[in-house]
Amino acid sequence: MAQPLVVKKDDDLDEEEYYSPFLGIEKGAVLQEARVFHDPQLDARRCCQVITKLLYLLNQGDTFTKVEATEVFFATTKLFQSKDAGLRRMVYLMIKELSPSADEVIIVTSSLMKDMNSKTDMYRANAIRVLCRIIDSTLLTQIERYLKQAIVDKNPVVASAALVSGIYLLQTSPEVVKRWSNEVQEAVQSRAALVQFHALALLHQIRQNDRLAVSKLVTSLTRGSVRSPLAQCLLIRYTSQVIRESSMNSQGGDRPFFDFLESCLRNKAEMVILEAARAITELNGVTSRELTPAITVLQLFLSSSKPVLRFAAVRTLNKVASTHPLAVTNCNIDMESLISDQNRSIATLAITTLLKTGNESSVDRLMKQMTNFMSDIADEFKIVVVEAIRSLCLKFPLKYRSLMNFLSNILREEGGFEYKKAIVDSIIILIRDIPDAKESGLFHLCEFIEDCEFTYMSTQILHFLGNEGPKTSDPSKYIRYIYNRVILENATVRASAVSTLAKFGALVDSLKPRIFVLLRRCLFDGDDEVRDRATLYLKLLGGEATVGETEKDVNEFLFGSFDIPLVNLETSLQNYEPSEAPFDISSVSLETKSQPLAEKKTTGKKPTGPASALSGPVPTVDASYEKLLSSIPEFAGFGKLFKSSAPVELTEAETEYSVNVVKHIYDGHVVLQYNCTNTIPEQLLEEVVVFVDASEADEFSEVATKSLRSLPYDSPGQTFVAFEKLEGVLATGKFSNILKFIVKEVDPSTGEADDDGVEDEYQLEDLEITSADYMLKVGVSNFRNAWESMDPESERVDEYGLGARESLAEAVSAVIGILGMQPCEGTDVVPSNSRSHTCLLSGVFIGNVKVLVRLSFGLSGPKEVAMKLAVRSDDPEISDKIHEIVANG
């Protein structure tokens, strides 16, 4: 086997260093050593050592050439003549790792088949594993009979080997493995723990795509036939899956199989108890009554003598405390004793759980205990502590001083990027949400950037300092920290510091002369970006730049959120041809468009006119449509195009004619662009037009129609219908559509169409114009700043009952769909089991009116959802309209 470790004494360091037995081995030398496989008198120990080295090389990523692999493979097959059991097991490993080709497999198959029928169970089990890894589907059918017998073999080692091989083969030959269901079901009843475990895993994988079959499997096994603790843990997971799926389809009542999960809490095996407790705590919408038995057993484990049980219990309780803190309060006394646990991971989880469940009076005591062990735990656990402190501070804002001091102290200690970022993010959130914490928080951040090794965090703090520092009682005290960055840091941080100085100069008149002096010094910086920024800001603050004609313009330029999606700007800049005319940033589309999943899949159809832009870069869509519509005389006088919708399908897939419609919204008009495709080779369509019935849309009046002269097979074309509406009116309605045309037969052999045609029509799906069509999805980079910059007088607040909903997520999605706005900062995602949620939306209403919405959702009953809607906009009337849209939605 492998040589023993070599221990060498280092005279200089006077300490022992341990070297790997494989240190310095080379592939060529090992391949030479492999010649021992050909010796007439095999040395089993020597052969095992060589195979170990070969396996090491393979697992380290060394590759063998085709010739080398073939030579090693054939040499290895000669070792089957040895009777040494240890060497035989190494041979199995070597063959499996070499992954021989189909031709080579045939050579070794006979030896493996012989071992598979051997009287030695260890040979049989290993031969099955190797065979199933190297054979193809053709050879599999030849040994299928042996594998089915092995599954029900009396020896558990052989049976487990066959079942594990079945799990592997299910990925490559699922149809073959599915024929083994009867044998696998028999193995599930085995008394051997591992056999039952592997059999249950394989049986579930065979049936996993059939929900009814999985439900029946769980029903039959929860009656008590499973004795293996490992298999019981699997069964608990499958039961949880069935409960989740059934809960989605039921409207209430008792959960199926919950009694089984509860009974597992009384199992003899600790792993089963923990698995059941974890499963109960992770159920969707779990109630306090359902949690109680799980919390009780977890509380018992907190005082266990086994560290792994204490860790598992406190980690589960930590997760529960995030959603059901009151349910965990009974465990607080037990968890306080764990703060001094020798295992720092357990102590960390205990104290963070207490932070989530504790009251205001216990904060100072917990802070003192936490200080003692922060240096002893890994960064990942430190991040957990920081997040818990942030939540606690927001929960008890009066305790911000002690919590902020704790954060600033650990910020000065050693730590990685993610850990430091978590602390900085927490301090920034506390400054934003607790006004009294602003001064001390900004001071701590300034001290941190004096010795910060992370460029990202330095620029983040400088940006935040530029927004919040000028609003403090003494802004001048921050200038020294900012200018130090210009002198001492790299180019990226220096550029950020220049921008921060300009923000102070724009908002604090008394500091402007000093800022001018500092910015002029930056004109001699060695970096282009720093010099350019300094030049721009000097002209801007001095009133020389065109953007800085008024103080409001300057502040908007410096502090306004960058509302243009970067991907749109990038595309426009790529299309911009350098000329004497400057680049017009107003030409860049503001709308944030996400491509639907269906559009990402290849449909096999040709793109339809300008709609083909959807398959390319998304931001060019509006420009393409605007160019097309302005070239049509009937629509040229409609003004600037506000928005173009995504295509709405009006026909089923695979029908004779494919039609979708794009809604183009103007201030006083709506143009419907019907993209048509003829999918019948034997037909030519002429004079194609869509007849639109607007009887259910009385706020619209048809003003123009543009027909399509000819629509050959598989050659997309467009027809248009334009409607007029009152400017400033949120006109909505439903339109019914009929495709009318003259159809002419086409000779397939010549491609010639008949002279005579027949008038025909084709019924299309109805189309709706909704309130969301008048809203552009435009994101903001910083919602809080954008909200505060809007006039509070424009704010309108009201509360609404949304009725019974399946979940908060469904309610959030429905309101976003009604408004057609862009979710900000990922707030469209609702955490599972949440009973409240805040969603932030932004957009531009027709007329280029910026709108911001803050939605607060809460569950007022079992499934009753209440919502508070706050709107701010550039026009108070639009704020009122947003409320009307929601009220009527």
From Swiss-Prot:
GO biological processes: endoplasmic reticulum to Golgi vesicle-mediated transport; intra-Golgi vesicle-mediated transport; intracellular protein transport; protein secretion
Topology in the lipid bilayer: Peripheral membrane protein
Segments of this protein annotated with the region Disordered: 596-617
Keyword terms, alphabetized: Cytoplasm, Cytoplasmic vesicle, ER-Golgi transport, Golgi apparatus, Membrane, Protein transport, Repeat, Transport
Entry's Gene Ontology cellular component terms: COPI vesicle coat; endoplasmic reticulum; endoplasmic reticulum-Golgi intermediate compartment; Golgi membrane
InterPro entries, A to Z: ARM-like, ARM-type_fold, Clathrin/coatomer_adapt-like_N, Clathrin_app_Ig-like_sf, Coatomer/calthrin_app_sub_C, Coatomer_g_Cpla, Coatomer_gsu, Coatomer_gsu_app_Ig-like_dom
GO molecular function, one term: structural molecule activity
Quaternary structure and partners: Oligomeric complex that consists of at least the alpha, beta, beta', gamma, delta, epsilon and zeta subunits.
Name used for this protein in its record: Coatomer subunit gamma-2
